[in-house]
A protein has these predicted regions:
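Metal- or metallocofactor-binding catalytic centers and their adjacent structured scaffolds
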Residues: 37-116
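Conserved small/polar residues in nucleotide/adenosyl-binding loops
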Residues: 200-202
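Active-site-adjacent beta->alpha loops and helix N-cap segments on the catalytic face
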Residues: 175-187
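Active-site mouth loops of central-metabolism enzymes
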Residues: 134-153
């Protein structure tokens, strides 16, 4: 089997309201999907991290930098492909966009392996360890509102997340130490002391 092409698909949708985190606010979200095609007709799908216009830069790296390096390679040789691309890109940085782009291709190669062997990914990476995977509810994004307004929004959203039987939740912070403390205390009070709560600043 050989890789015949790699395509990037940058998806974008407009948000109902502007949301943000400690670094910026945004009115739309993007997702960057990577499609690796083979001569056997098996197609692998991966995803690159890259919000906003970063997805466009990653698209360029996937299609114009990585694709020429791997056309004709056997997609089942995932580790060899990863090392080849990484070693040729590492002078451009060992983190950030080159690695984000490579990760999307790598995920697609795992998808191809799973489809070729008719195996779920968990079997390919060492076997099933758990019957259940805990998930958390995520929300409480920052908005351009006063802290008092955000407290009311966050309290309500936290209650909604908890009511959906999640075992934990994650909220955004990043307004500043005093403001963040007020938001966290309000959410903690609304969900109780025993419910797991995590914070993300970025």
């Amino acid at each position: 089997m050989k890789i015949t092409s790699i395509k990037s698909h940058v998806l974008r949708y407009e948000l109902e309201k502007e949301l943000g985190y400690s670094q910026q606010y945004y009115k739309h979200r993007t997702a960057h999907l990577v499609e690796v095609q083979t001569d056997e007709g098996i197609i692998g799908w991966g995803e690159c991290f890259g919000p906003g216009n970063i997805a466009l830069a990653n698209k360029f790296i996937v299609e114009k930098v990585i694709q020429p390096l791997v056309i004709g390679e056997d997609p089942l040789n995932k580790e060899q492909i990863w090392q080849k691309v990484y070693n040729l890109l590492r002078d451009s940085g060992q983190k950030g966009m080159p690695i984000q782009a490579l990760s999307g291709v790598d995920i697609a190669l795992w998808d191809i392996l799973g489809k070729k062997t008719n195996s779920p990914l968990y079997q390919l990476v060492g076997g099933k360890c758990n019957n259940d995977v805990p998930v958390y509810g995520y929300g409480m994004m920052l908005q351009k509102k006063s802290v008092d307004e955000l407290i009311l929004l966050f309290e309500e959203e936290a209650k909604q997340i908890k009511s959906k039987n999640f075992k934990a939740m994650k909220m955004k912070v990043g307004l500043g130490p005093k403001e963040d403390l007020k938001l966290v205390q309000a959410v903690r009070n609304s969900i109780g002391k025993d419910f797991k709560l995590s914070l993300i600043h970025i």
